[in-house]
């Protein structure tokens, strides 16, 4: 199913309404990344057919076919004055769609299907697709800020240093998902060396030796890992988090606070807010924007763009409805993922050692 010429149909012809014949209805385009996450996209289409309000909306379903395809599709839908473009995918798909909708009348909607789902989580959009469809029917349209890193838009977080390096390694991995990300994080953290950065912001200059520098428009990377827990999407400011060099003894507290929304209280963390930030480093390297890696030069300019994107959000969403029990559950879930990754990594290393021992034993027995 290709591009903009398709009128509301999918592979199973589930959708009987044709947007070309329903001019009075609000037009919504659903852009699906077929390879994101593990959720069945065909099942999501069935739920759409069952739950979407067909009296109000004429829907169109389009599959992406390559990297960057969602940018093109969303731009065309914005030109056609679609009411909304709904991303069915992960943070990368959301970024591609949202960058084409900034400063237009077309709103972004999200049915999260990715590994992290950072923006969806910050907006309190349910992780269950059926409930996310309810938000499209009953939600409100809010206007949020977005950021740019060397003129590349981001909507959740961007950064340099270790998190960007891990994003690069993760993009090369055959497997996807949170456990793969944690595995890469644990393995690479043993080898990664902090760099020295010069930061210019709002008229002042500072130097830091840092493990990573994260700039948050939203509060989290995804999977409820809150790198900028105080960040909001409509304050016109970047929340900058600097993680200074640390020891292995700091890892438990950093992990605890990352998932408990209190990492800004750690002694190894420095935070500040600004509208613009220039990061100068000694050599070109990788950066990340919304979890996707990109190579950039020595100078990295980050800035906030105020109130540039319309998004569909839950009607009853508040600025922060989390409570102590929810934070505790988030932390437990986070620790379980870390523990699972540790166990998987240890088992893998033990297997490698065992295999090596077997090979050496065979060599010795042949002598």
Predicted feature residues:
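Short, small-residue-biased leader/transition segments that mark boundaries at the very start
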Residues: 1-8
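ATP/NTP phosphate-donor binding region
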Residues: 12-85, 318, 325, 329-338, ...
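Glycine-rich beta-strand-to-loop/alpha-helix junction loops that act as flexible
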Residues: 34, 88-90, 113
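ATP/nucleoside-binding phosphotransfer catalytic cores, i.e., glycine-rich phosphate-binding loops
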Residues: 41, 201, 232, 242-367
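Catalytic core of DAGKc-family lipid kinases
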Residues: 55, 103-107, 111-215
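Short glycine/serine/threonine-rich phosphate/pyrophosphate-binding segments
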Residues: 70, 92-97, 118
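Glycine-rich phosphate/pyrophosphate-binding beta-alpha loops
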Residues: 159, 214-228, 293
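Gly/Ser/Thr-rich active-site loops/lids in small-molecule metabolic enzymes
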Residues: 174-180, 229-250
């Amino acid at each position: 199913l290709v591009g903009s010429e398709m009128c509301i149909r999918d592979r199973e012809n589930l959708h009987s309404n044709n947007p070309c014949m329903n001019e009075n209805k609000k037009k919504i385009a659903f852009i699906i990344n077929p390879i994101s996450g593990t959720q069945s996209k065909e099942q999501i289409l069935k739920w759409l057919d069952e739950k979407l309000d067909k009296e109000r909306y004429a829907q169109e379903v389009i599959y992406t076919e390559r990297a960057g395809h969602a940018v093109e599709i969303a731009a065309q839908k914005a030109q056609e004055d679609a009411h909304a473009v709904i991303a069915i995918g992960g943070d990368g798909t959301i970024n591609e769609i949202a960058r084409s909708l900034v400063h237009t009348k077309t709103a972004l909607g999200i049915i999260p299907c990715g590994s992290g789902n950072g923006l969806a989580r910050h907006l309190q959009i349910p992780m269950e697709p059926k409930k996310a469809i309810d938000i499209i029917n009953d939600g409100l349209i809010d206007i949020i800020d977005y950021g740019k890193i060397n003129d590349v838009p981001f909507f959740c977080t961007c950064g340099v240093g270790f998190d960007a390096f891990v994003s690069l390694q993760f993009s090369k991995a055959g497997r996807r998902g949170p456990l793969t990300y944690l595995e890469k994080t644990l393995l690479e953290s043993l080898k990664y060396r902090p760099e020295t950065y010069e930061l210019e912001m709002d008229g002042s200059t500072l130097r830091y030796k840092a493990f990573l520098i994260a700039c948050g428009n939203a509060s989290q990377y995804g999977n409820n890992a809150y790198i900028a827990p105080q960040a909001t999407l409509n304050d016109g400011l970047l929340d900058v988090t600097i993680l200074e060099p640390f020891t292995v003894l700091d890892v438990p507290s950093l992990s605890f606070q990352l998932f408990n929304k209190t990492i800004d209280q750690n002694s190894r963390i420095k935070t500040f807010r600004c509208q613009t930030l220039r990061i100068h480093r000694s050599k070109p390297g990788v950066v990340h924007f919304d979890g996707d890696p990109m190579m950039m030069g020595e100078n990295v300019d980050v800035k906030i763009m105020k109130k540039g994107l319309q998004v569909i959000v839950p009607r009853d969403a508040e600025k922060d409805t989390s409570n102590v029990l929810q934070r505790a559950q988030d932390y437990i879930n986070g620790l379980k993922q870390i523990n699972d990754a540790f166990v998987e990594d240890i088992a893998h290393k033990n297997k490698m050692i065992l295999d090596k021992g077997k090979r050496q034993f065979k060599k010795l027995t042949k002598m």
